[in-house]
Amino acid sequence: MNRLDFVDQASLRDDIPVFGPGDTVNVHVKVIEGAKERIQVFKGVVIRRQGGGVRETFTVRKESYGVGVERTFPVHSPNIDHIQVVTRGDVRRAKLYYLRELRGKKAKIKEKR
């Protein structure tokens, strides 16, 4: 193991649940406003997960008042308090970019049995 891998290993979090594209997750994000810090929940469908190690990221998409909102988070970020998996989705793709064009019930993902 080289030096970079050793440094990266120290930065990895071990409290991340197993989740993938199609899963609905609650991401509890630490938000700093002035001197105060609070936790904001971002609930949506994971549309992609990419990278590896410290650089691994995932993108969550949700509809807010008829507008699609996507947010990309680093998996091992200290700004994420915790991730909670709400439902497991049954999808056949690793990247769910096609959900961007779908609205309403068509954008719904079947739940894994």
UniProtKB/Swiss-Prot annotation:
GO terms for molecular function: structural constituent of ribosome. The keyword DNA damage does not apply. The keyword Ribonucleoprotein applies. Transmembrane segments: none annotated. SUPFAM superfamilies: Translation proteins SH3-like domain. Pfam families: Ribosomal_L19. PROSITE patterns: RIBOSOMAL_L19 (PS01015). Keywords: Ribonucleoprotein, Ribosomal protein. GO terms for cellular component: cytosolic large ribosomal subunit. InterPro entries: Ribosomal_bL19, Ribosomal_bL19_CS, Ribosomal_bL19_sf, Translation_prot_SH3-like_sf. GO terms for biological process: translation. This protein is located at the 30S-50S ribosomal subunit interface and may play a role in the structure and function of the aminoacyl-tRNA binding site. Belongs to the bacterial ribosomal protein bL19 family. This is Large ribosomal subunit protein bL19. The lineage of its organism: Bacteria, Bacillati, Actinomycetota, Actinomycetes, Mycobacteriales.
